[in-house]
Amino acid sequence: MGKKKYLFLIIISLLSKVHAEKIIFSANSMTGQAGNTNTTTYLSGNAYIKTDSMEIQADSIELSGEDYKNIKAQGKVVGKNLEANMEFTCDSLDYNRVTKVAQLNGNVNLDDKDNDVNAKAEIITYNQEEDIAILQMKVNLVQKDNVCSGSYAVYYKKTQILELSGNAQVKKKDDIFRAQVINFDMNTQDIKLGGNVKGTVKDSKEKQNAEQENDLQPNQQNIEENQQSVENPETKDDKSKEAVKGETQ
């Protein structure tokens, strides 16, 4: 019982001399020298680490480099970028505390909470200083009613600009735009297409007609029932006559 409690309470706070950043981490087990920041430290089992700008949970975490500048996480990675207000999940992560660049690998899901943007890809590299994310392979980004996809993308968080390439596509409700390169301003909703441009756009009249057809469908059954009542008035009269006969008897 005492051993389990000790492992659960392994929480070490370090003050980096160079970067003046406090690091807090915990795990079920640890190997390495906690007081020596020039060695590699391994955390395994419910590994957790928190810096001033990043919070990470994973099956295992490795800390290395001078003042533990390199952080590697493996297995069911869940994290938050506290400064950028972004949350993410992935299979593995590499983060450099000095450059503040994080690379998320495998089944990456990234949520930009400030702009209500969700991004998915196999690899996402996020530069915290520049507020720029580079998405690679199976890119899918959703913002409001817009669904954007491609093989490569650059997402500018501050300006809300998205650059798509490689079978690039932007779908805005019923409208679809395809090109080799797409530049999409998510603030103004302006789209610039370049190379092998294709698109399908519904005009306002078509959209209005489609909406009217949808509104008419639920009333169709009532109309048919009313028509049947008008076409067969004798049925109602016969029932009335039978009721009168019954009362007379």
Report residues per predicted region.
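Mature-chain termini and adjacent capping regions
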Residues: 1-249
